[in-house]
Amino acid sequence: MKLHLDDNALGTCVSCGLCLPHCPTFRVTGEEALSPRGRIAAMRAVQFESAEVSGDFVHFMETCVQCRGCEPACPSGVPFGQLMEGTRDTLAGNKRMTPWWQRLGYRVLGHHRLLLAGSSLLAFGQRLRLVPKRMGLPKLPLRRGAPTPSSGNDAWLFTGCVMDAWQRDTHRSTAKVLAAVDVSCRVPGSGGACCGALHVHAGLIDEAKSLAERVIGSMPGDAPIVVNSAGCGAALKDYGHLLGTSEAEEFSLRVYDASEFVAPLIDRLPIRRRLGPVTVQDPCHLRHVQHAHLPVRTVLAAVADVVELDDEGLCCGAGGAYSTLQPELAGQIRERKLASIGRAGPQVVASANPGCAYHLAAAGVHVRHPMDLVAEAL
């Protein structure tokens, strides 16, 4: 089996090891094979030396959180995220390597009504204690409220799949904050639900491309696109690479994380009260991929005293579906984050990504979305 990776990108790594301290799986295991350098060595063996795609190789790749914390640390600019996505694409092409229940779950994400129905069943099952706590799910709402209303055409508010099913309150908060800075918003039309981020993580590239094309078609024009999920925002900003078209490139240039969009307009916010101290947790795809973690601090500083963690943005272990697929490693990685949160002191943690929020909340952390906190102060 050949991985079909870019030879130049794969050959860029000089094995310096500067990535190792930034890799969550290496930090908790100390295993070279579970580091970016070790995984690239395994990719090279398959790509250049026709090594067998063994069970060990699959394990090395599937245990990667895809946090991409190694990329900013790499002096050679190795595009590790793209290499891992390409490798996962090859592995996913062999259906024997992807369990049926995983494929079913990813298909549900692309069909919004099925996701909403499934979420309601999960919420009901939680009340009856039929859903195992080890799944790490937050307490899901039995009633999610009305969809986010459109107020005008200044910007698009991307609603997504999981966020719309589980966190409509955050969409309403985001719309409230946008209105407070004199920006009206509207939600995507048909097809603008799932962005395909989890599909890319799983290597289901064809499915991700199909979803991306639908999302692009759901938000025409040149209005900015505001996204309040870090994982979704990173995916939308990467559509140019995913689809390789000028239309996708132009679309990606319109995408902003919610805090990234609001920060330059912060002086317009009519703050009515200040909140207590808030600790900031940086979602990996906001910090390492979008490089948009600083605006979160700008926005939160307008309503609260911001407290920093001392772990330099190390991954929390959520990784999209990672905490469900690799619960043991995800739990070990989370323990390091919990220790850092404990040292920070304040009881409220702000996270701009649902996966991170749910993963931390499952361990008892009080997590709020930055937009929810800002809206509360208005």
Where are these regions (language model features)?
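Cysteine-centered iron-sulfur cluster-binding motifs in ferredoxin-type domains/subunits
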Residues: D7-F26, S54, V58-V78, G313
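Iron-sulfur cluster-binding electron-transfer modules in prokaryotic oxidoreductases
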Residues: F80-L378
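Non-heme iron-sulfur electron-transfer modules
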Residues: K2, F26-H59, G77-R103, H366-V374
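Short, charged low-complexity linear segments at domain edges
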Residues: M1-L5, L34-G55, D282, Q290-L300, ...
